[in-house]
């Protein structure tokens, strides 16, 4: 079958495209711009067109699109004219899973789903279960970063941003939490949002939930939490090299967990994975071995650069909700106790900024200094009055040292470089390219390590 993917550069879309390519289908696609994923797919021999155009046409049997692709996209218009079936990526993915009839491990929720999915996949690979993995991030141990084909169970990250996620029926499901992100896709109805989680839980054999989550804790056959839940934990130690925690089951000491990835939120992610595999009757010794070996996912507290002479770090992180940012900064302060923490934050989506507003500033105030950029729209239309300046204004009202830049190239004017500083480039948009440019500029100008601050303080 010949399949055309419109928006193939997305992390979820490219994973589905890789799956169809590995199944022997004739795959090609288009994207609005070049990305690391489009470059990777092209190297594999998959034809990629940039940008979108009605001329990007190989007479496909099927066109697959993401919700970000509008109906007036020239390729979608042509597909309708040619009477070629058009399917939403999530719908097609659900139908693919139904056809293949494999054991399914799924992870959904607002925060932590990529890392938790990666942990589940890593454990199953360690156990030699040969999983097929669909990941919303890049993990070095997967053949294609965000995808790997196996002959065992399927592990996938399930994006709750679309209400259709409730139509899936995995065998096993971890719900990390549900904080109302993407509520606009549910008619701004919390009842409708909650109902979607309830629906998928009814279609699942075993559900693991966070015991302290108001919306979904009651859905769990098994729960995990800090002090509340079937599985709880007590931190023993945390350093740059390792975290240790005592896991309790039903209030009794059960086992010791060791992790090489930093952050208390990752301890909770690992606890969810332990709850899942223990409830399924797995021997936990190799599960714990796998978790201790786990090295994380790209853009999740990823150290992109370190200069040992000046003790300057550059870290990339995908955090884009207030809770994720709070977890990130708490981790940074634990790992870098004596360094200055500077955050360069790119808000992601106007709808999220409008909904959360002051919550971003409350999370960001944990940093020593904050630079806020303009919003990365993620294909949303700009909303009047909604701007990154809102966060900047809120930070100033909290007495926090903060700066605002409208365009990413202006970052150079406002970032002050000094020794013993950790620079966190944070967001789900294209802020990672600013991180790389920052490192390049720093390396080329080490002889003059100070920069003049801008005037928009």
Curated annotation (Swiss-Prot):
It catalyses: UDP-N-acetyl-alpha-D-muramate + L-alanine + ATP = UDP-N-acetyl-alpha-D-muramoyl-L-alanine + ADP + phosphate + H(+). It holds the Pfam family Mur_ligase_C. One of its GO terms (cellular component) is cytoplasm. Keywords: ATP-binding, Cell cycle, Cell division, Cell shape, Cell wall biogenesis/degradation, Cytoplasm, Ligase, Nucleotide-binding, Peptidoglycan synthesis. It is found in: Cytoplasm. Pathway: Cell wall biogenesis; peptidoglycan biosynthesis. This is UDP-N-acetylmuramate--L-alanine ligase. It comes from Thermotoga maritima (strain ATCC 43589 / DSM 3109 / JCM 10099 / NBRC 100826 / MSB8).
């Amino acid at each position: 079958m010949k399949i055309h993917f419109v928006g193939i550069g997305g992390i979820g879309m490219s994973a589905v495209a890789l799956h169809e390519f590995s199944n022997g289908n004739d795959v090609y696609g288009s994207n609005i711009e070049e990305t690391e994923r489009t470059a990777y797919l092209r190297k594999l021999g998959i034809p990629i067109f940039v940008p979108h155009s009605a001329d990007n046409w190989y007479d496909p049997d099927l066109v697959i699109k993401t919700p970000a692709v509008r109906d007036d996209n020239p390729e979608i218009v042509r597909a309708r004219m040619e009477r070629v079936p058009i399917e939403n990526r999530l719908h097609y993915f659900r139908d693919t899973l139904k056809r293949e009839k494999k054991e399914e491990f799924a992870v959904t929720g607002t925060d932590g789903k990529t890392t938790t999915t990666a942990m589940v996949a890593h454990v199953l690979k360690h156990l030699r279960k040969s999983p097929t993995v669909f990941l919303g991030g890049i993990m070095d141990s997967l053949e294609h970063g965000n995808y790997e084909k196996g002959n065992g169970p399927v592990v996938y990250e399930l994006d709750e941003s679309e209400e259709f996620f409730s139509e899936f029926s995995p065998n096993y499901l971890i719900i990390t939490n549900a904080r109302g992100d993407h509520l606009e896709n549910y008619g701004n109805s919390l009842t409708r949002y909650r109902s979607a989680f309830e629906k998928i839980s009814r279609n699942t054999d075993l559900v693991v939930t966070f015991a302290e989550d108001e919306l979904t804790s009651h859905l769990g056959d098994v729960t995990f939490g800090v002090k509340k839940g079937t599985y709880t934990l007590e931190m023993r130690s945390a350093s740059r090299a390792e975290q240790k925690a005592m896991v309790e089951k039903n209030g009794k000491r059960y086992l010791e967990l060791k992790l090489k990835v930093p952050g208390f939120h990752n301890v909770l992610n690992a606890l969810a994975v332990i709850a899942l595999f223990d409830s399924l009757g797995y021997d936990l010794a190799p599960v714990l071995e796998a978790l201790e070996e786990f090295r994380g996912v790209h853009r999740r507290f990823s150290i992109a650069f370190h200069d040992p002479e000046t003790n300057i770090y550059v870290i990339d992180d995908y955090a884009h909700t207030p809770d994720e940012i709070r977890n990130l900064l708490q981790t940074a302060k634990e790992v870098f106790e004596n360094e200055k923490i500077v955050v360069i934050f790119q808000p992601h989506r106007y709808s999220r900024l409008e909904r959360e507003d002051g919550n971003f500033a409350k999370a960001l105030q944990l940093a020593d200094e904050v630079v806020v950029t303009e919003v990365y729209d993620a294909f949303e239309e700009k909303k009047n009055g909604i701007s990154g300046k809102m966060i900047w204004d809120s930070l100033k009202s909290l007495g926090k040292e903060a700066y605002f830049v409208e365009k990413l190239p202006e970052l150079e004017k406002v970032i002050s470089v000094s020794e013993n500083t950790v620079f966190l480039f944070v967001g789900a948009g294209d802020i990672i390219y600013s991180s790389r440019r920052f490192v390049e500029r720093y390396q080329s100008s080490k002889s003059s390590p100070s920069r003049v601050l801008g005037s928009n303080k």
